[in-house]
């Protein structure tokens, strides 16, 4: 398992590397406080625009790097417009992250 200091450091690396970061959200078991030794780290990056999601994903995964032995990273990237639209729909991952996630970076007014 990893601690919040390690998670916040990973989020800071994402913010530094992202093209137009508006929000970084921790979701899943680490956000709920139910993480165990087999848990991965679920992070969502919201950017103003994401013209090439695949390229941005590769850049951000490189920036996050290896968190800790045996800890995988699930990284999701969404443009702000999609986050705002689909984050209102119950049952979606965006809704879960928006309602239960922990915001680690917020540049929205």
Regions found by a protein language model. Give the residues of each.
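Catalytic core of pol beta-like nucleotidyltransferases
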Residues: 1-23, 32-37, 47-109
């Amino acid at each position: 398992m990893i601690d919040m200091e390690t998670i916040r450091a990973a989020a800071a690396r994402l913010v530094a590397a992202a093209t137009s970061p508006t929000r970084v959200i921790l979701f899943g078991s680490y956000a709920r406080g139910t993480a165990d030794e087999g848990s991965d780290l679920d992070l969502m990056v919201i950017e103003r625009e994401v013209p090439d999601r695949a390229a941005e994903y590769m850049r951000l995964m490189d920036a996050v790097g290896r968190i800790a032995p045996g800890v995988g990273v699930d990284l999701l990237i969404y443009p702000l417009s999609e986050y705002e639209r689909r984050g209102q729909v119950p049952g979606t991952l965006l809704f879960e992250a928006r309602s239960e996630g922990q915001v680690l970076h917020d540049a929205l007014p």
